[in-house]
């Protein structure tokens, strides 16, 4: 959430940041709300000071021997009660305006960091580096073709069970999915991450705190009879793991890794990636998440990105790192690196991880703080990154490992988990 103080003191900075995202927002109504709140606060403080003064005066007169039921005392108490009523009215007005202000601020995205890569859309993103040698060839198949030949999954029966964009994995694919999850968790735990297994259902406050609500309500699955939603990513419950807390500075950074099923409605993606594992309503993902001090969050983004890259390197999958421009940033992010894995069957790079520094955006929405060196409460910075999306990783393994005899060579790092170095036709 954008800092209200910034809205009052430097609205031009907000306007410029939003414009760099391609948004032209009239901040006038928001500034009016801030001005009204400031005036009401001053008025309330003045009235409360008067009320306190009257209370002291009543106490002094009673000490001097004036009877409790004297006319003078009664008049003072009447005046004091009138002030209390006025204060109550002002507080209700403040609450109403504050709610309206928050409703609008919650719909504004994070501001890009200073000196960001300017751009309108993904065409303006910048490739930073590559790893591995992409293979190519006219006879290479896409992962869904390979899966059908090896009988790895069934999407048709899954649409009977649920609807389209669901898949049921069988035998080797189910085992490979499980192997990838355990491999990724173990790799990150060795790097010092603390494993957590969060709930797959989250409440509205959790989705609001991480930035999914209210903007993206249509993108998530909601339970009909409860204030619960299926989580779109483990980022949501991990953000709320410390909601409303003050985390001791000596515990920072907190680094979590979590496996979770993820659920997304994929509204607006009709007709795109209808086959295979690229765009499903339900998929598994291993998520990396940091709670960092503000001064270390830039370095933390480089580290979390490196940790996500290490998974691809261990799995021998070629990839590239892309810095997103301001117009392509996610809602909660102020800076993002995407990792795109090479899919030779499709002859393209596809996003497999997105690593973002959210600054204090989520921490402000979720009230997550620490103390600075002067013992003053300050907001933390949060960072997240996929480490990795399991289905897309499996797709990359199938396409990059395909052999002329129809078998699939598996990465050496998976052999201890899968128990074999190949997938073979049966």
Curated annotation (Swiss-Prot):
Keywords from the UniProt entry: Aminoacyl-tRNA synthetase, ATP-binding, Cytoplasm, Ligase, Nucleotide-binding, Protein biosynthesis
SUPFAM superfamilies from the UniProt entry: Class II aaRS and biotin synthetases, tRNA-binding arm
Pathway noted in the entry: Aminoacyl-tRNA biosynthesis; selenocysteinyl-tRNA(Sec) biosynthesis; L-seryl-tRNA(Sec) from L-serine and tRNA(Sec): step 1/1
GO CC annotations on file: cytoplasm
Catalyzed chemical reaction(s): tRNA(Ser) + L-serine + ATP = L-seryl-tRNA(Ser) + AMP + diphosphate + H(+); tRNA(Sec) + L-serine + ATP = L-seryl-tRNA(Sec) + AMP + diphosphate + H(+)
Entry's EC annotation: 6.1.1.11
InterPro entries the UniProt entry points to: aa-tRNA-synt_IIb, aa-tRNA-synth_II, aa-tRNA-synth_II/BPL/LPL, Ser-tRNA-ligase_type_1, Ser-tRNA-synth_1_N, SerRS_1_N_sf, SerRS_core, tRNA-bd_arm
Keyword Nucleotide-binding: yes
GO molecular function: ATP binding; serine-tRNA ligase activity
Residues that, per the record, bind ATP: 264-266, 351-354
Cysteines paired by S-S bonds: none
Binding-site positions, L-serine: 233-235, 287, 386
Subcellular localization(s) per the UniProt record: Cytoplasm
A single BP term in Gene Ontology: seryl-tRNA aminoacylation
Family annotation (Pfam families): Seryl_tRNA_N, tRNA-synt_2b
UniProt remark on domains: Consists of two distinct domains, a catalytic core and a N-terminal extension that is involved in tRNA binding.
Quaternary structure and interacting proteins, as annotated: Homodimer. The tRNA molecule binds across the dimer.
Annotated function: Catalyzes the attachment of serine to tRNA(Ser). Is also able to aminoacylate tRNA(Sec) with serine, to form the misacylated tRNA L-seryl-tRNA(Sec), which will be further converted into selenocysteinyl-tRNA(Sec).
Family statement: Belongs to the class-II aminoacyl-tRNA synthetase family. Type-1 seryl-tRNA synthetase subfamily.
Name of the protein in its database record: Serine--tRNA ligase
Annotated source species: Prochlorococcus marinus (strain NATL2A)
Encoding gene per record: serS
């Amino acid at each position: 959430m954008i800092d209200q103080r910034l809205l009052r003191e430097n609205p031009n900075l907000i306007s410029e940041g939003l414009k760099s995202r391609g948004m032209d927002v009239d901040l006038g109504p928001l500034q009016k709300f801030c001005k009204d709140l400031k005036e009401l606060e001053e008025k309330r403080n003045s009235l409360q000071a008067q009320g306190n003064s009257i209370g002291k005066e009543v106490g002094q007169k009673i000490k001097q021997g004036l009877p409790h039921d004297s006319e003078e005392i009664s008049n003072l108490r009447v005046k004091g009660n009138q002030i209390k009523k006025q204060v109550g009215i002002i507080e209700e007005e403040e609450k109403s305006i504050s709610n309206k202000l928050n409703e609008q601020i919650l719909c504004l995205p994070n501001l890009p960091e200073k000196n960001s890569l300017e751009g309108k859309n993904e065409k303006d993103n910048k490739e930073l580096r590559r790893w591995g040698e992409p293979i190519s060839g006219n006879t290479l198949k896409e992962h869904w073709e390979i899966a059908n030949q090896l009988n790895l999954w069934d999407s048709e029966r899954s649409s009977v069970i649920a609807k389209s964009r669901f898949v049921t994995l069988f035998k080797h694919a189910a085992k490979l999915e499980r192997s990838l999850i355990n491999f990724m968790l173990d790799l990150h735990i060795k790097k010092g991450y603390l494993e957590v297994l969060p709930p797959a259902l989250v409440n509205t406050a959790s989705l609001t705190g991480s930035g999914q609500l209210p903007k993206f309500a249509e993108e998530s699955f909601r339970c009909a009879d409860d204030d619960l939603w299926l989580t779109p990513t483990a980022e949501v419950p991990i953000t709320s793991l410390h909601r409303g807390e003050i985390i001791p500075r000596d515990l920072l950074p907190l680094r979590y890794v979590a496996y979770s099923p993820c659920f997304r409605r994929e509204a607006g993606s009709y007709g795109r990636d209808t086959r295979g594992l690229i765009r499903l309503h339900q998929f598994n993902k291993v998520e990396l998440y940091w709670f960092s001090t503000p001064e270390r969050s830039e370095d933390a983004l480089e580290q979390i990105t490196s940790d996500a890259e290490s998974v691809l390197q261990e799995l021998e999958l070629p990839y590239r790192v892309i810095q997103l421009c301001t117009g392509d940033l996610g809602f909660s992010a102020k800076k993002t690196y995407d990792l795109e894995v090479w899919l030779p069957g499709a002859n393209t790079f596809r996003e497999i991880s997105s690593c973002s520094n959210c600054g204090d955006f989520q921490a402000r929405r979720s009230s997550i703080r620490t103390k600075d060196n002067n013992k003053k409460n300050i907001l933390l910075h949060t960072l997240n990154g996929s480490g990795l999306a399991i289905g897309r990783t499996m797709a990359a393994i199938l396409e990059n490992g395909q052999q002329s005899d129809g078998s699939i060579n598996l990465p050496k790092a998976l052999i201890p988990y899968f128990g074999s170095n190949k997938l073979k036709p049966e």
